[in-house]
């Protein structure tokens, strides 16, 4: 409890209560050109397409109050950086928040655009970048949701006011008690997650430890052997924050996720990446042992993942192009920058790691390199957990999970098992004992076999002990802060040696067109400042160390390279 209080005290909400003072963020933004395929109808679909996430019943969220008594949805969650959605599926929900179901069973969830829609501000004008890294404080949102629901479980007056909003002044007999039981049932796993997972040193805006939270949700809340399905000791501090990646061209990478552990290349592999994501973002998922299913598990009986919606979202993401720089460009200088970009790495160039490398007709080859940057995320990939109900579960051709096994392996088996059961009819059906003797390996196709390698830990070598993906840099101007952990505010700063980079900086929507990145003055999240560490603490999660390329270029060459990166 003490840890939760510290987390809440340090929560960025206290800072975010001053958020969005810029009128530009409330006005209609300029929608940037992101290619002919990206249309207004696609945008609206992307903003509210359900993927199976279930945060909370919609009537509850509408009735919920902040500590000062104002509705939790009063500002459409703008205090956390979420963006207004005039065409939201329910009043008060921002971009990326969804509604599924009907009536009292309507559930609010989150979808891709909550974390992958960016808005920046220059001279009083806001610019919208779809598929860009969100500038949101997700940890503050999580902590404050816990803070809002907690009193309902112990304070009669608070619960009575909440229940009246939902049930009316004269609810039928038993309705109040049933609602209280449902709230407590919701709160126990959620509070367990928040109390154990959220770190003392907050992620801050524009960053989150997504991989840890996926591991924590799945192994801590979902795979216990009986309701409430909890294995609290599996939940670890989510202390390896990264910046949200941009989505344009993501479907063309042959590997995704910052350490490059998720394979890409066909619809099933894209689905695997997205199913893992939705399990981490509030999907309801409780796999169960089943001797009547060929995989020995029933992954779909209690599973809210919307496979159709996830497929549609992947199709939408493929249509998002890199945003075009909306301000003036010195074309002559940019041409000089293009020549510098094309140099070899040891000459200050970028193309050897960040150029387009055609792998086949569909994919680009994505190099994995250790460039000396923060190593913390690799540590969490090796975490061990109790496997609970999934002990003995396996993928076709694979080894069964042990009682204690890797969180990474549990995720891989759960995701592959869910998709196989959904898409391969014989694996999704119940069978008698005779039919159950059929080996699941015998029904695998060349396509479904690829699921078996959908998640693979990156190969760590002596030369590259902590590798991360080197992405194509189209649209990189719109993705600050930089490095995988968001520890460098601008591209100009990234071209300096690590020892000379700023140690701390504010985070927000104000943009610097000259330095190409976050402006030095921010108001969106009050006085929040991200404090980084140097190379002496490479595993802190906040190290600004590494990627010392182009640092020896002349000042004129650096200006030229920055100008080119604006239009790349």
Predicted regions and their residues:
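N-terminal secretory signal peptides that target proteins for export/translocation
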Residues: 1-6
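Intrinsically disordered, low-complexity regions enriched in polar/acidic and amide residues
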Residues: 8, 17, 383-385
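Bacterial N-terminal signal peptides
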Residues: 11-22
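Periplasmic c-type cytochrome electron-transfer domains
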Residues: 27-568
């Amino acid at each position: 409890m003490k840890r939760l209080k510290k987390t809440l005290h340090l929560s960025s909400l206290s800072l975010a209560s001053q958020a969005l003072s810029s009128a530009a963020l409330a006005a209609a933004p300029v929608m940037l050109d992101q290619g002919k395929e990206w249309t207004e109808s696609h945008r609206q679909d992307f903003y509210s397409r359900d993927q199976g996430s279930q945060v909370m019943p919609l009537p509850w969220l509408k009735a919920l109050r902040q500590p000062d008594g104002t509705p939790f949805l009063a500002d459409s969650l703008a205090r956390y950086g979420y963006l207004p959605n005039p065409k939201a599926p329910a009043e008060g929900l921002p971009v990326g928040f969804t509604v599924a179901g009907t009536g009292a069973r309507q559930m609010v969830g989150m979808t891709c655009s909550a974390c992958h829609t960016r808005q920046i501000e220059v001279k009083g004008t806001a610019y919208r970048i779809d598929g860009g890294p969100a500038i949101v404080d997700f940890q503050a949102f999580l902590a404050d949701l816990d803070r809002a629901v907690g009193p309902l479980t112990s304070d009669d007056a608070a619960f009575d006011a909440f229940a009246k909003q939902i049930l009316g002044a004269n609810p039928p007999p038993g309705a109040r008690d049933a609602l209280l039981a449902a709230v407590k049932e919701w709160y126990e796993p959620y509070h367990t997650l928040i109390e154990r997972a959220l770190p003392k040193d907050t992620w801050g805006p524009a960053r989150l430890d997504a991989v840890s939270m996926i591991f924590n949700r799945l192994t801590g809340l979902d795979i216990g052997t009986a309701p409430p399905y909890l294995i609290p000791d599996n939940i670890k501090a989510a202390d390896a924050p990264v910046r949200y990646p941009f989505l344009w061209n993501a479907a063309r990478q042959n590997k995704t996720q910052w350490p490059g552990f998720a394979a890409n290349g066909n619809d099933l592999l894209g689905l695997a990446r997205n199913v893992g994501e939705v399990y981490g973002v509030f999907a309801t998922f409780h796999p169960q042992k089943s001797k009547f299913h060929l995989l020995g598990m029933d992954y779909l009986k209690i599973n809210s993942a919307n496979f159709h919606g996830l497929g549609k979202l992947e199709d939408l993401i493929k249509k998002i192009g890199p945003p075009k720089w909306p301000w003036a460009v010195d074309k002559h200088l940019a041409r000089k920058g293009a020549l510098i970009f094309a140099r070899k790495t040891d000459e200050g160039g970028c193309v050897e790691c960040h150029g387009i490398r055609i792998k086949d007709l569909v994919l680009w080859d994505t190099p994995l390199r250790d460039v000396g940057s923060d190593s913390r995320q690799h540590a969490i990939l090796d975490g061990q957990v109790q496997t609970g109900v999934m002990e003995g579960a396996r993928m076709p051709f694979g080894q069964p999970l042990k009682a204690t096994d890797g969180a990474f392996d549990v995720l891989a088996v759960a995701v592959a098992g869910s998709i196989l059961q959904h898409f391969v009819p014989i694996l999704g059906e119940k069978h008698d004992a005779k039919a159950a003797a059929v080996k699941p390996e015998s029904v695998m196709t060349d396509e479904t076999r690829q699921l078996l390698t959908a998640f693979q830990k990156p190969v760590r070598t002596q030369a590259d002990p902590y590798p991360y993906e080197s992405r194509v840099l189209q649209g990189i101007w719109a993705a600050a802060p930089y490095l995988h952990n968001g520890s460098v505010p601008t591209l100009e700063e990234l071209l300096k040696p690590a020892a000379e980079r700023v140690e701390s900086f504010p985070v927000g929507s104000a943009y610097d067109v000259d330095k190409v990145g976050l402006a030095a003055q921010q108001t969106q999240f009050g006085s929040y400042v991200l404090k980084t560490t140097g190379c002496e603490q490479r595993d802190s999660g906040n190290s600004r160390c590494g990627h010392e390329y182009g640092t020896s270029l002349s000042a004129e060459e650096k200006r030229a390279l920055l100008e080119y990166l604006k239009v790349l």
